Swiss-Prot record:
GO terms for molecular function: ATP binding; tRNA binding; tRNA-uridine 2-sulfurtransferase activity. This is tRNA-specific 2-thiouridylase MnmA. ATP binds at G22, L23, S24, G25, G26, V27, D28, S29, M48, G137. Transmembrane segments: none annotated. Disulfide bonds join C113-C209. The keyword Endoplasmic reticulum does not apply. It catalyses: S-sulfanyl-L-cysteinyl-[protein] + uridine(34) in tRNA + AH2 + ATP = 2-thiouridine(34) in tRNA + L-cysteinyl-[protein] + A + AMP + diphosphate + H(+). The lineage of its organism: Bacteria, Pseudomonadati, Pseudomonadota, Gammaproteobacteria, Legionellales. Its EC number is 2.8.1.13. The gene is mnmA. Residues 159-161 are annotated as: Interaction with tRNA.
């Protein structure tokens, strides 16, 4: 059994080694920094600014997050450096998301941010400051088996974030640490409260990071030109108008404004598909409508965490959403960048642009983008 990189069995570092911690101002990264500090490592904090915003923006929490990060760094007794990656974030994450939205897909910016910003730009910056590793407050584990690194699920199945880390490579895992991967979220909050952290009860961040709590439609309108169009049934019957298909995702119920039709039952309507060429939103009625379910998908942009990819066909588990239970499937290789995934049971609301992530037991193998 290899070395698992979390608090109950940290890597065999020299205690005078410098470990940088990505301090977000949240409770998870704060406790991660505390754990490392109390194990005798020299810890430095790094706060990322990934989005340029007006300080008066009521929806942006960056100013408060930085204030919290400074307070925690002072409380623990570590230095804190502020680094601005807004240009890199725009080029490698946000622009990609805009392109995907414009094509009617639903991207996952957290996945790209982890690969391109946190575990690339931030890791590189940490190295320049003399750190040997970058630590974050992610709920996941890293295992070293004969210098091959495996990404494992967190001990807290409800908070596991391996789904969002599936694009990391061997170098990134070898130079990263997840100090709270062995904890339950409740334990992390209890530690923070016991130590008097001001953020011990701070709400977890949710949604798309650069949008914050503002309305998704209002934000996207600032960057993309919306084209209103028809809402149709699969049979082609026009039953309403949409504001722009980029605002909707498969499985969505809210915001359609087509309920209470005299020619339909009382069951709610759900988005089942988006016809980008015709600019048409296709909807069906009822949560269990058969067209909302599919037993297969194809994916592209394949990435395998280990240097040697698995043999195909591969029977394993998969997730098409981060909080979904593992689903049994068979993966068949189509070419170097595409594969076919056949599920044992039909899956609801498979969404183009989202990630499908593969698992064998607790190990995250990698994944791809649903096509």
């Amino acid at each position: 059994m290899g070395i698992i990189f979390y608090t109950t069995q940290m890597p065999n570092f020299e205690q005078n080694q410098v470990i940088a911690v990505g301090l977000s101002g949240g409770v998870d990264s704060s406790v991660a920094a505390l754990v490392l500090k109390e194990k005798g490592y020299e810890v430095i904090g790094l706060f990322m600014q990934n989005w340029e915003t007006d300080s008066k923006d009521p929806f942006c929490t960056a100013e408060q997050d930085l204030s919290d990060a400074k307070a925690i760094a002072d409380h623990i007794g570590i230095p804190l450096y502020v680094v601005n990656f807004s240009k890199a974030y725009w080029n490698h994450v946000f622009q990609h998301c805009l392109d995907e939205f414009a094509q009617g897909r639903t991207p996952n910016p957290d996945v790209w941010c982890n690969r391109e910003i946190k575990f690339k730009s931030l890791l590189d910056h940490a190295k320049k400051l003399g750190a040997t590793h970058l630590a974050t407050g992610h709920y996941a584990c890293i295992q070293n088996e004969n210098n091959e690194y495996r990404l494992l699920k967190s001990n807290d199945s409800h908070k596991d974030q391996s789904y969002f880390l599936h694009l990391l490579n061997q170098y990134q895992l070898a130079n990263s640490v997840f100090p709270i991967g062995g904890y339950q979220k409740s334990e992390v909050r209890a530690i923070a409260k016991k130590r008097g952290f001001i953020n011990h009860a701070k709400k977890d961040s949710t949604g798309i990071c650069f949008i914050g709590e503002r309305k998704f439609k209002d934000f996207l309108n600032e960057f993309l030109l919306a084209q209103p169009g028809n809402i149709e049934t699969p049979e082609g019957k026009i039953i309403g108008k949409h504001d722009g298909i980029m605002f909707y995702t498969v499985g969505q119920r809210k915001g359609l404004h087509i309920g209470g039709r005299p020619d339909a039952g009382e069951a709610p309507w759900y988005v089942v598909d988006k016809d980008v060429k015709r600019n048409v939103l296709i909807v069906v009625q009822g949560y269990e409508h058969p067209l909302l379910y599919s037993q297969e998908l194809t994916c592209t942009n394949l990435h395998w965490i280990r240097d040697t990819e698995p043999s195909f066909p591969l029977t394993c588990k998969a997730k098409t959403r981060c909080r979904q239970a593992d689903q049994t499937c068979v993966i068949t290789r189509l070419d170097n960048d595409h594969c076919h995934v056949q599920f044992e049971h039909p899956q609801r609301a498979i969404t183009r642009g989202q990630s499908v992530v593969f698992y064998l037991g607790n190990e995250c193998l990698g994944g791809g983008i649903i096509n």
